[in-house]
Amino acid sequence: MATLPRAAPPTPAALLPLPRAAPPLLLAGRAAAARRSRLRARGPSAAARRSWVVASAASSSSRAVVGGVARREAPPAPQKPTQQAADLNHILSERGACGVGFVANLKNMSSFDIVRDALMALGCMEHRGGCGADSDSGDGAGLMSAVPWDLFDDWASKQGLALFDRRNTGVGMVFLPQDEKSMEEAKAATEKVFVDEGLEVLGWRPVPFNVSVVGRNAKETMPNIQQIFVKVAKEDNADDIERELYISRKLIERAAKSFSWADELYFCSLSSRTIVYKGMLRSEVLGQFYLDLQNELYKSPFAIYHRRFSTNTSPRWPLAQPMRLLGHNGEINTIQGNLNWMRSRETTLKSPVWRGREHEICPFGDPKASDSANLDSTAELLLRSGRSPAEALMILVPEAYKNHPTLSIKYPEVTDFYDYYKGQMEAWDGPALLLFSDGRTVGATLDRNGLRPARYWRTSDDFVYVASEVGVIPMDESKVVMKGRLGPGMMITVDLQTGQVLENTEVKKTVASASPYGTWLQECTRLIKPVNFLSSTIMDNETVLRHQQAFGYSSEDVQMVIESMASQGKEPTFCMGDDIPLAVLSQRPHLLYDYFKQRFAQVTNPAIDPLREGLVMSLEVNIGKRGNILEVGPENADQVALSSPVLNEGELETLLNDSKLKPKVLSTYFDIRKGLDGSLDKTIQALCEEADAAVRSGSQLLVLSDRSEAPEPTRPAIPILLAVGAIHQHLIQNGLRMSASIVADTAQCFSTHHFACLIGYGASAVCPYLALETCRQWRLSNKTLNLMRNGKMPTVTIEQAQRNFIKAVKSGLLKILSKMGISLLSSYCGAQIFEIYGLGQEVVDLAFCGSVSKIGGLTLDELGRETLSFWVKAFSEDTAKRLENFGFIQSRPGGEYHANNPEMSKLLHKAIREKRDNAYTVYQQHLASRPVNVLRDLLELKSDRAPIPIGKVESATSIVERFCTGGMSLGAISRETHEAIAIAMNRIGGKSNSGEGGEDPIRWNPLTDVVDGYSPTLPHLKGLQNGDTATSAIKQVASGRFGVTPTFLVNADQIEIKIAQGAKPGEGGQLPGKKVSAYIARLRNSKPGVPLISPPPHHDIYSIEDLAQLIYDLHQINPKAKVSVKLVSEAGIGTVASGVSKANADIIQISGHDGGTGASPISSIKHAGGPWELGLTETNQTLIQNGLRERVVLRVDGGFRSGQDVLIAAAMGADEYGFGSVAMIATGCVMARICHTNNCPVGVASQREELRARFPGVPGDLVNYFLFVAEEVRAALAQLGYEKLDDIIGRTDLLKPKHISLVKTQHIDLGYLLSNAGLPEWSSSQIRSQDVHTNGPVLDETILADPEIADAIENEKEVSKAFQIYNVDRAVCGRVAGVIAKKYGDTGFAGQLNITFNGSAGQSFGCFLTPGMNIRLVGEANDYVGKGMAGGELVVVPVDKTGFVPEDATIVGNTCLYGATGGQVFVRGKAGERFAVRNSLCQAVVEGTGDHCCEYMTGGCVVVLGKAGRNVAAGMTGGLAYILDEDDTLVPKVNKEIVKMQRVNAPAGQMQLKGLIEAYVEKTGSEKGIAILREWEAYLPLFWQLVPPSEEDSPEACAEFERVLAKQATTQLSAK
């Protein structure tokens, strides 16, 4: 065997430059400028300030760069994570996103140019990647290509070796251990497996590299990189050769497990066709690091490239991409369930191609690897088992085919394919752009929601390109014959053997036609048709009551949940947040479900809107045995298909009567006659054994039932969630899970959260028999009948009541799935997407294995006792004749303790209004003596010092500067409340938060007209002072973008991006029309009375790199404002926060689950989000361990009421502290808890003028409160012996457990909260005082530096200029708009800037434009064009000479005009998904759009002169849309929930449409527009007008507008 000595690192001059003439020069200049700016920024502020710079370009300046002075000269290397930091599920520790693409030659001609182009494209997407704390270690970059045989033959010949047999030789790209001895052991072990397999090892080749370009952190973990060549002589078939190499690799991985270096051995690739070069590198240095990639003998017909942005900064070389088959941009949300199900399949997978060796290729997943690595592993298994890459990905990542009229009508075989595999393989669900190649085919596919950008183009010289962005490779546009984009669920493939390019349906039809899937489904799959509900009760009232008591129902559960759902058909809504103790801290018994909190999407993947985007979601589920996924046949279709997992009694009976399922009913009761201790455990073990035996005997359906005609006092029911989870886990561990489905037939399930838990832990369906009986009982009660008879309640039949209940449950399930960004119930089933608070490891290991439970808690015996405490109530002699009210939802005497209670409110009001220290002391004592309510109540401060005089402690005025108020929107609360809070915070130097909804510009200037506490400027307030300002220092950017204008942003000290809200994380919001007064409508650029919808996700944040882009945009328009990102506490938040820090945020806010809300479903308030104590601890520790803590201020909020809360939060690492509900109480809130009704009795949360007039608050009250809190902090610091709050921040060693003994806290472990990862290098004050993070050199600076442009802005003149633009130039014109908005406001600029750009614009082109800015782009643009624009004109046209037809080409990306409040946009060509999403007042014309056009639109006008995608106008409550429908296909694509479709009949509408097209033609020269105007009379009838209710009476929409207007005038006169 021959080896080649490792090459010495070459000199920089020897490195091959990327061949792009203009951009590198431009970028180099910016990089130099960035370095100069860093040098100028050294030294924290005047005293201690540091500036973090992230440059805009794909160059060395594109990474975070650190400069400055800290407590020591050189920052330390990141510490390796401790065991405590790793106390999370491995899955949560690796999240990310990226930029990807491929280049392919249709003639299969290999060339070095392809590799060079791929490297160039990779370099131009550096901004989509991330770097570690050293700002130099890339999160990962890589390239996959064909094996470069010419290069390897050249090497072999130089070594005196024979040339390789290219057909039969495999090449392994191997990461080996660093240690020399371990490396030799690994090589020997590898060779042994190959030899044992009958393969010939030809030799090892050390891969030549240049280590000087590797970052410091990446260098520490850099492997020894070598290639191994093996000959597979025993196989002739090419697929068999690949399969033999796959088996060998699996055997090597298995053999390595017995060695200490097992985790250090990794095959990037092992194939005769493809090879992967990757590492923890930045894009631009991949080609400099691997010297092979500079060698012109490296030739390939294709190349896939990938740049990673990981939220985790600990370098892990193997997780760089591409993987062995895939390059993945996105995140798999269902990964835990996918891994569980793949583990379950290991015993069932069989295929002749494996020749009986299936057991040797297990396991099929690795929880320690990333989601991308596991998806790649599964796809590779299918590929090596005989599937094509396209087929494998159709199985794993199916499109949303159910609501796709084109597929169902034109390609029924494709829908049959998806229906067949729906029952075999749960979808790997989540945002995903997947590029793939097996060496013969290269392609790309997009997830069902289309959540990642994917543009493609084809040239006349036979090249195909796919990339996350356009403009990454210089292109002669005259050669481009096709420009398109992948829409949701779409696929494109290039067959390198035949040169065919297959687009979407062509690919899928070919795959789906291979087998008669439709015939198999018709013959084998049974569909359960809906069965009628029972029409009478089956229990008497006393029996119902006994069951309800035994199974833990309260009167609130029945009246506020079940009955409300039965009556209304939707989940009940409540407000003010969850202020009762966690279940484990409560002194009252709780159902097992209450120990579980739903997880939710934030930052790394988006939530989904289940109401407006329901076409991508499904609750369908199949029952029965899941077959062998590696084989295709009719037996796999032998299942029962359910349309929903919620069954009534008749539907359950149908399942039980299905003989093919061989159903087995298992009773879930345990016997306590021999004592309680151990009985629950023994019964569950026996239950698992019974289930095991039943499945081995052929049962395909296990029904776990607690149904009993006569419950017995000594045989309580096992909590059904515990039974389901235990059997689910047992069957997985014993290889039986695929053989049977689990159905729960239970009394203990009535809320949507209960259903979600059961399904999440393994149940396929649930029959809630007692809840349904409760619905029937309610409907037949005299009270209900009387209410219906008197018109005080909607009239429903007994069947409708049950149907309404199930409808509400199904809607609630969709919402819970959508919070996590999951579309399919089949993917949610068994995915365990919950966090546990209060269950011990014994319980978790038994039934909920893999779920995160950080604080421990109840044992099985304790859980049994809690279960029994409900059960005995039903059988005691003094059993109540009605259900008990536990007070879990509403505060009531004798009920559960609520932190926001009337007594607390009265004591606080007394203290702050009287401004007496002793009154505040009484308030403090009340809080100190309350029952344990939150985790921090279990902790107290201790000191390692003697007390000091309070006079030595920093002042209260200094402390209050760290205080903030929560983001409460003007609209949810009244103007009076909003302004009073802002004035108070400005007086003390703290910060108020605008919340969503904007702000009146009148508030941005200090008051100078105050007399006797009143001001004509703000006449509705009292207690004012001259010098007061009502501006909110923190201005919020939420998903609805309401009120977000350029002027709003430039008047912010800080800008908060609200990702999630503690009381309802993962959900959007809706301001009801009754709260949208004329004033609110003006601020939100809407009409009075129009409901205003905020989407669940930000539609420009689907991943971590998207968040980085929005932060970049905001820094662009206001470079002086710090950008904050608000997250909600959950397991894994530390990893997310690391990504947020790397995304260049200045501040991270952690919110607890107990924060307030104006309105939210009860299940969300109660069951989503976690305590901030855990989230803050994890975030602080993770940031410290990753070397990122100094970059960001940590702010925390959620239930803060006192100085004690501040002190504990400080010790846990927080720099700043947020107060929400208590601030409202201080300004007058009386906790009526009816915020969502608009009937607040004191006008705090109402827009009704007569109620607002009752507002009692004055700013001074809130000032007094915060000063009291600060003095409390001072007194505590003095007692602790510390002079500054700085000195205790992060000092968890100053915390200790209180000596409190509660019934359920005996086994709680607070070790995680008390653990310490060390302190940051800087003090909190230094971190808080550092400069705003910047974008580095940007094109806007060049524009603003132009003397003519500067003069035009300063003196309101007209100027025309032109600039070249590249994809690395992002948010172009945002900085210019900010300068104009700061000087003139949103509408005051009278000058005119006419700027033309030539080239490919980066993301957010033309964002935040103001009137007077006329921007023209000749070329193409990426995502977010016109984001937040308030005026001006934005035109995008292709270059003059193109090889494609402009109206057929995608010319701009996704999510254009997001939140636009004015201006005009004209695009000659097509746009991507979500064009004009949340458009307020912008007018736009485009020649075609993707899905979700005009979503959530509230104003403006959009004209589409071509095809639109699906789900048009979903959530559209204002504005008008005109869409040309030449082929009569639009009607089924429109979401008609709100809008109506009509032809353009109104003369004003015709004029508006024609006028916009005329302007469009003038600006773009569109041939399509010219043709329409030329034949206007023929085209006009082909247009549809989409009209929401708010526009029905407008002159443009109402053909009889004049008559309607006259009628309204007559009515008004009559009224007078």
UniProtKB/Swiss-Prot annotation:
Co-factor: note: Binds 1 [3Fe-4S] cluster.
E.C. code: 1.4.7.1
Pathway(s) the chain acts in: Amino-acid biosynthesis; L-glutamate biosynthesis via GLT pathway; L-glutamate from 2-oxoglutarate and L-glutamine (ferredoxin route): step 1/1; Energy metabolism; nitrogen metabolism
Reactions listed under catalytic activity: 2 oxidized [2Fe-2S]-[ferredoxin] + 2 L-glutamate = L-glutamine + 2 reduced [2Fe-2S]-[ferredoxin] + 2-oxoglutarate + 2 H(+)
Location of the Glutamine amidotransferase type-2 domain: 98-497
Domain of life assignment: Eukaryota
Entry protein name: Ferredoxin-dependent glutamate synthase, chloroplastic
Organism: Zea mays (Maize)
